[in-house]
């Protein structure tokens, strides 16, 4: 029997834990992340001969390393242990929920966007163009009602083809946003970094984090460029 690992990411109250519980039932374990007081939840389920291990990562609003929850989430994503990262967004508050995606653009891991609470969005009279969102972001988009297991059909169909369909979020729009809001300083710093980025992090994402003075990103860059380049970055 083959095995795959899914990481669940999302803002607090995105329905992430509801989906986790719906998929795993009693097949779950709760503990702490090593060296942290942050709760770790993992579980598993079987679908069409494949065992899926699910990691319910802490609810966060970004991947900046400003809290233990954010550090845990970012380190796990960077570890490459997940075969696919499922990001949950609240379909009833789509603009607000999609804002967090900017922080995942530029991190080169396979991503699927799960639009949860589609029933609420529908009751509000909202029509969501999932195909249009998928085309814009460059990743699969799956409508979902995490509180209703009968609505998991499209999620399971996504799993069956995830090896072929999951892809990295497009970062070109992220770069444009930073360039328009920050100006030439963004481009100047980006030009000092390795063109291919560092590890799973693109140069665009690293530049954004450097400008936020993200301590972990600063340390990573310092370890991977020469002293004169890092001095110029500072």
Feature roles, as predicted:
Residues 34, 53, 65, 69, ...:
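Helical mechanochemical/support elements of P-loop NTPase systems and associated helical scaffolds
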Residues 35, 59-60, 91-95, 117-122, ...:
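Conserved nucleotide-binding/hydrolysis micro-motifs of P-loop NTPases
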Residues 43-48, 72-140:
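Conserved C-terminal guanine-recognition region of P-loop GTPase G domains, centered on the G4
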Residues 121-174:
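Canonical P-loop GTPase G-domain recognition
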Residues 138-140, 165-234:
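Extended helical scaffolds that flank P-loop GTPase cores
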